[in-house]
Each structure stands twice: as C-alpha cells, then as structure tokens.
Design a protein with these regions (language model features):
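Extracellular loop-to-transmembrane helix junctions
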Residues: 55, 82-107, 121-125, 132, ...
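Extracellular/periplasmic helix-exit of transmembrane alpha-helices
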Residues: 102-115, 261-269, 289-319
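C-terminal membrane-solvent junction of multi-pass transporters and transport-like membrane proteins
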Residues: 195, 368-379, 400-449, 453-457, ...
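Flexible loop linkers connecting adjacent transmembrane helices
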Residues: 39-45, 79-84, 107-132, 157, ...
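Juxtamembrane transmembrane-helix boundary signature
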Residues: 67, 94-127, 136-142, 347
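Loop-to-transmembrane helix boundary motifs in multi-pass membrane proteins
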Residues: 130-133, 168-171, 286, 334, ...
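Transmembrane alpha-helical segments of multi-pass small-molecule transport proteins
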Residues: 137-141, 162-184, 202, 206, ...
Length: 479
C-alpha cells in the first residue's frame, strides 16, 4: 500500500523560535509534513461525520482495545495474583486508581495524535534536542523490552502449562507472532483489531467462569476499592502496589495510542478533529473499562481462591494453575486459566510489536520494511527472555515478571511528562490544548507517579531483603 501523508491540519499560523512553554521551535515545526508512523495503515479506515452516532462509534471502535491489551498482559497476572493471595481484596483500590489514571492519560494521548497529526514519539523528536530525544528513545526501548519480557514469558509459561513444552521452546515459538502481525495487517488494520477483540473476549469469558466458581466475598471486594493508608505503610504491599501501577499504566501505550488513532480517515477541520477526539476517548475509556474488569477479576480470583483459604503465598503463576482446579472444585478451571494466559500473552506481544515499530520510526525516523521492523522489535524481547530462562532457570519467572512491571513504573515519567507538556501547549495543540482543570489533574497524576516511585526507591534501599531480591533478579536477567 502506498504511503499516505496526513492532510494539512488547521493550526495557528507558524511562529519561529522557541515557544513560551519551553518547546524548542514547536510552532515552527508543527506544520512540517512528515511521514506518519505505521504508514501502511494510516487513514485506511473510513470515518464519516455525517453517519449516525452508532456508526461513528463502530468506526472508531478498535484502537482503544489494542491499547487495553497492554493493561491485561501477563505482567498484571503476576502482580494481581500475588497481591490477591497475600493481601486479599485490599489492593483493588490500587487497580481502580491505576485504571482511572490510565483512562485519563490515554485520552490525552489520543487527543495529541488527532489534533497534531503526530504520535508522541514524533512530537518528542521534533520538539526536544537530539540528545534528549535519543535519551527518551532509549528509555522507551527499555520499557518495551521490560513489557515484552513479561509478555513472552507469560506466553511461554502458558504453553508449558497446556502442552508441557520447555519454557525456552515456548519463548522461541512466540517469535512466530511476527508472522501473525504481518498476515493480519496485510489484510487491513481492521483484521488486527478484530483479532485482538476476539482474544480479549476469550480472556473475559475464562475469568467469568473462574470467578463464578471462586465465590468471592463481594462485600469485602467492594470495600477493597476504597483506598487505605496501610498500603503506603506496608513495605511488601507498596512494592506490589507499584508493580500494579507499572503493569497497568504502560509507557509504550501512550506512544501506541497517539499513532493508531490516525488509522481513521477523519476530516482535517477543527470540527471534524474535535468529533474524532470525542469518539476516540469514548472508545479507549470503554475498552479500559474491560481491562479494569479483567485486572480486578484476577486479583479477586487470587483473594477468593487462595487468600480466604489460607494460601497466602501463591505468587507463582504455575502454582496458581496447579491449585485452581482442586481449590475451586472445577476441572476446567486450571485449563481455562492457562488458555486465558496464552491469549493475553499473544495479544500483548502483537501490540508490543506495533509499539516498537512506532517508537523506532517516531524517534529515529527510520523507515524499514515491515517484516524487518517487526523482526528487530521482536528480537529485543526474545533474546532477553531466552537469556533469563537459560541462566536464571524457570523458578525465577514470576519474580522477574513482577520486577519487569516495577521497571515499567520507573519509565512512566519519561512518557507522561512530555505528553502533558505537549497537550498543555497552545502553540502546538491550538484550541485542543488542555483546559486549566485538565492541566491540574494531569500534573497531579504525574506527581503521584513520581511520589510512588520515590517511595519505592526509599523502601528498596532501606530494606536489605527487598534490595537483594531486586539486585538478584536484575543480575539473573542480565545473565
């Protein structure tokens, strides 16, 4: 498919020099024509402003679900199961707050992509110095590698549980998902979205079955959604809580969302873009609502199946698999758990591969053939995962899954702060710039992320046991 160039967007007249908000030559460069990320899919899905409300919703349905995949990946499973089995329903409030933060940040990401015709990576490359841009690219690649590590390991664990395959063989098999991405995207971006939505539906069905047989204490679960100060005081609880935050609010999803909303062929007028922003936010909020249900279901399952039965140390995914059927008295419970894990891993690796392509093209402006781009981004995940299993052994998989989510949490400020800075900039966004209330909420979210990260660092360096665990896992993952 020939590459398309985004239409000229209606923006304020170009102004040269540095802007008042510190963006280097932002207004001077925002009208410069650049090739879009994912050029083979750019503006390929029709969107008519004259269609009915339902047809508009359907036209924009899809990007939000690709984003939601990252909020229910195998990294979430490790943190949610560990949190549920050890602390019961207490950490449900963290799941809720994390998902609300994710909904807010993804709305800003979608607005950036639609209003400017740039994804977040392209905006960073244009408006920061080359050195800063390269730093942000490296940080983002680390985040993607950590996320992909969790996804690849999750898929490998599922294959082992279902078919008895060694973990290393499972990791190598996951490399084949590159072919799935190529085959689906070759038929159109709608096929990618349909594939992802189908897998999400299968995950939700599996957990609906598990929850039905787990018989949760619904009153205690409802109370669990109320935040408690105990979470900040308890070292282990805070460690898992920040892992949940890192597993829920994914840095690379902010880059992904700002790009894939541009697969819709909305008009270039201010009115058309405003309408597109509205439907894009509706799509992502609804999709992340499903992600909230699945994340909460995993933690509730851990609490109902294990914590209430005195099993407080079920942190390994494999242990959860072995215990589910006998504990719940349902023969299919363990099998469905593994099937959902496999679906989650495949879904996440697919979107992670797309995010890797977007980040590479956006930050470095490197245009490679689709198969080569995806082979490179897949290798970034496959190689570390193979090294981890080869040198660390299979018994450290879940601890590394949790650690990967904590690493993701540390990467968040480097994606969130540029996103807020850009969407606050009237010279870049025009009348789409954040309102005063949105700006206050955005910086509050950023401050909360920084606070939790600083608190975790303090706890890690104050506690030798946690420090040794983290350093040991890092050394193992490095081989």
């Amino acid at each position: 498919m020939a590459r398309t160039v985004p239409p000229q967007l209606e923006t304020d007249p170009p102004v040269t020099g540095e802007t008042s908000d510190g963006l280097c030559s932002a207004s001077a460069t925002r009208n410069r024509v650049v090739l879009p990320s994912l050029p083979e899919s750019h503006r390929t899905i029709p969107f008519s402003s004259g269609a009915s409300w339902f047809r508009k919703v359907l036209a924009f349905a899809g990007p939000g679900y690709l984003v939601a995949v990252g909020y229910m990946d195998p990294g979430n499973w490790a943190t949610d199961i560990g949190g549920g089995s050890k602390f019961g329903y207490t950490l449900l409030s963290v799941v809720l707050i994390s998902n609300l933060m994710a909904m807010f940040l993804q709305a800003l990401s979608a607005k950036l992509g639609i209003a400017t015709g740039r994804d977040l990576a392209q905006a960073c490359r244009e408006h920061y110095s080359r050195r800063t841009g390269l730093f942000l690219w490296v940080v983002c690649e680390i985040a993607i590698a950590a996320c992909d590590l969790a996804e690849v390991l999750g898929s490998a664990v599922a294959l082992k549980l279902l078919f008895g395959l060694p973990l290393l063989a499972g990791v190598l098999i996951t490399a084949l998902d590159v072919l799935i991405v190529l085959a689906l995207q070759g038929r159109g971006f709608r096929f990618v979205e349909a594939f992802v939505v189908t897998l999400i539906a299968s995950i939700a069905t599996c957990f609906g079955y598990e929850i039905f047989f787990a018989h949760p204490l619904w009153r205690e679960a409802a109370i669990g959604f109320i935040p408690r100060a105990e979470i900040l005081r308890n070292r282990e609880m805070l460690y898992i809580a920040i892992g949940i935050l890192g597993a829920t609010v994914m840095p690379h999803n902010l880059y992904l969302h700002s790009s894939i909303v541009q697969t819709r062929a909305f008009g270039s007028s201010t009115r058309d873009r405003r309408e597109a922003v509205r439907y894009a936010i509706f799509d992502s909020t609804l999709a992340l609502g499903f992600a909230l249900f699945i994340n909460a279901a995993i933690l509730v399952l851990g609490a109902a199946a294990f914590h209430t039965r005195g099993l407080h140390d079920v942190a390994e995914i494999a242990d959860a698999y072995k215990l589910l059927s006998p504990v719940l008295g349902a023969s299919l419970a363990s099998t469905l758990f593994a099937c959902a894990l496999l679906a989650s891993g495949q879904n996440s690796t697919l979107t992670g591969t797309l995010a890797g392509q977007i980040v590479m093209e956006g930050f470095l402006d490197i245009r490679l053939k689709p198969w080569l781009r995806r082979l490179i981004t897949r290798s970034i995940a496959i190689i570390p995962a193979a090294l981890v299993i080869g040198f660390a052994g299979e018994n450290k998989v879940t601890s590394l899954l949790i650690l990967s989510q904590v690493i993701l949490s540390f990467q968040l400020p480097f994606a969130v702060i540029p996103l807020i800075q850009f969407t606050n900039s009237r010279s870049k966004m025009g009348e789409f710039a954040n309102s005063r209330l949105t700006t206050v909420v955005a910086w509050f979210v950023a401050a909360a992320i920084l606070f939790f990260n600083a608190e975790l660092l303090w706890l890690i360096f104050r506690s030798a046991s946690v420090l040794n665990e983290v350093v040991s896992s890092l050394c193992l993952s490095a081989g």
